[in-house]
UniProtKB/Swiss-Prot annotation:
Primary gene name: sstT
Function: Involved in the import of serine and threonine into the cell, with the concomitant import of sodium (symport system).
Family to which the UniProt record says this protein belongs: Belongs to the dicarboxylate/amino acid:cation symporter (DAACS) (TC 2.A.23) family.
Native species: Streptococcus suis (strain 98HAH33)
Transmembrane regions: 17-37, 40-60, 78-98, 138-158, 179-199, 212-232, 295-315, 336-356
The keyword Transmembrane is assigned to this record: yes
Protein localization: Cell membrane
Annotated keywords: Amino-acid transport, Cell membrane, Membrane, Symport, Transmembrane, Transmembrane helix, Transport
Reaction catalysed by this enzyme: L-serine(in) + Na(+)(in) = L-serine(out) + Na(+)(out); L-threonine(in) + Na(+)(in) = L-threonine(out) + Na(+)(out)
GO BP annotations, alphabetical order: serine transport; threonine transport
GO cellular component, one term: plasma membrane
Membrane-topology annotation of the record: Multi-pass membrane protein
Protein name (record): Serine/threonine transporter SstT
SUPFAM superfamilies to which the protein is assigned, alphabetical: Proton glutamate symport protein (SSF118215)
């Protein structure tokens, strides 16, 4: 027994996660009624979501408190990469829908009664209201826009504090980072529970009737992850991007695939950025910001399902409308930040561009929930891994200057 524990301790995290995945699948197929196994997954995701807002608040506040006025930052480059990458993904999704048009079977019933935003203006309004949220409420509800805003305010104020106060802030950030490390160490057990829950509840046939739609969604995300993002990275870094791309997918993408949340994966991404040599002043802001605005996977989901509805209803879409859809999907995708399945609720916003009634749009959302078992996981993996990729790309681009 001691030998097994010793081997387990020496094994790297990715291999441990792989073992967790295999065990989760086997247990889900063999013993689906032992539902207590799923509790490991719920506890793991809950722990990550609980610690992530505190981690963001302390790291951002500490980074800004230590940064002297006028210090150079790569944030402008990172933000530009986030926005351009999301738009490029949205446009690729429209192109894929033109090449492989898919029609949906829409009924008169819906699978969800959640009220989506009524327009792009409402999405922007919600984001602005999040900025001025009560800081305690922002932490409690994982409102990362609010957390980032207050962390920036506190960090700037701490610049004028005494050295003792700054040291206390640094110690607090280090303590929370240590706790995050402990939680991430439990990832194999948590992911085993998440995989078990998915297999036990849905089996291997849950997505059979929506195979083509799922194939288009996942195929577009893979194309963006392995072609579009590396191309953007190459144009910025002027060097082979694939070793970095695969590292981001291997570490960040795999974990996010199972947590199904960019927000829950923030601690994992921050540790990866640290290991890749990124300036803490950059990644402590860019990673939580990316979990909010860098939503390539969400933009793909919104566009492909909207275009499927358009094809189903026989609506003609010209190039300018497709371009507008890509812009709206890119901007709306920010409203899906950190929420498992959140992108589906933005589909009615895009459908409204083509005069599709909200009742029908919500049926499309219902279809999305059916394929969401895998779609949401792939979406989170793309979103989260791209956060790290573009942060590192901006950093390495700055090294050359």
């Amino acid at each position: 027994m001691n030998k097994i524990i010793s081997v387990w301790k020496k094994m790297n995290l990715i291999r441990k996660i792989g073992i967790g995945v295999v065990l989760g699948v086997l247990l889900g197929l063999i013993a689906p009624k032992i539902t207590v196994i799923a509790l490991f997954g719920s506890l793991f995701v809950g722990a990550l979501k609980a610690i992530a807002p505190l981690l963001v608040l302390t790291l951002v506040a500490h980074a800004l408190s230590q940064a002297p006025a006028g210090q150079k930052s790569n944030m402008r480059t990172v933000i530009c990469l986030y926005l351009f990458g999301t738009f490029a993904a949205a446009f690729i999704a429209v192109g894929a829908s033109y090449l492989f048009p898919i029609k949906l079977v829409l009924s008169t019933t819906t699978t969800t009664d959640i009220t989506p935003p009524q327009g792009i203006a409402e999405v922007f309004q919600d984001l602005l209201l999040k900025v001025v949220d009560n800081p305690i409420n922002a932490l409690a509800t994982a409102n990362y826009i609010g957390v980032l805003t207050w962390a920036a305010v506190f960090g700037l104020a701490f610049r004028h504090a005494s050295k003792t106060t700054k040291d206390l802030l640094q110690s607090t950030a280090e303590v929370i980072s240590k706790v995050v490390g402990w939680i991430i160490g439990l990832a194999p057990f948590g992911i085993m529970g998440l995989v078990f829950d998915t297999i036990a509840n849905n089996g291997l046939t849950a997505l059979k009737d929506y195979g083509l739609l799922l194939l288009l969604l996942v195929g577009s995300m893979i194309f963006v992850a392995l072609v579009v993002n590396p191309l953007i990275a190459f144009l910025v870094m002027k060097k082979n991007p694939y070793p970095l791309v695969f590292e981001c997918l291997r570490v960040s993408g795999v974990t996010a695939f199972f947590t199904r949340s960019s927000a829950a994966n923030i601690p994992v991404n921050m540790q990866l950025c640290k290991r890749l040599g990124v300036d803490p002043d950059t990644y402590s802001v860019s990673i939580p910001l990316g979990a909010t605005i860098n939503m390539a996977g969400a933009a793909i989901t919104i566009n492909i399902l909207t275009m499927a509805a358009v094809h189903t209803l026989g609506i003609s879409v010209d190039f300018s409308s497709a371009l507008l859809l890509s812009v709206v999907a890119s901007l709306s995708a920010a409203g899906a930040s950190g929420v498992a399945g959140g992108s589906l609720l933005l589909i009615p916003v895009a459908c409204s561009l083509f005069g599709i009634p909200n009742e029908l749009a919500m049926q499309v959302v219902g279809v999305g929930f059916v394929v969401g078992v895998i779609q949401d996981s792939c979406e989170a993996a793309l979103n989260s891994s791209t956060d790290v990729l573009f942060t590192v790309v901006a950093e390495r681009s700055a090294w050359k200057k």
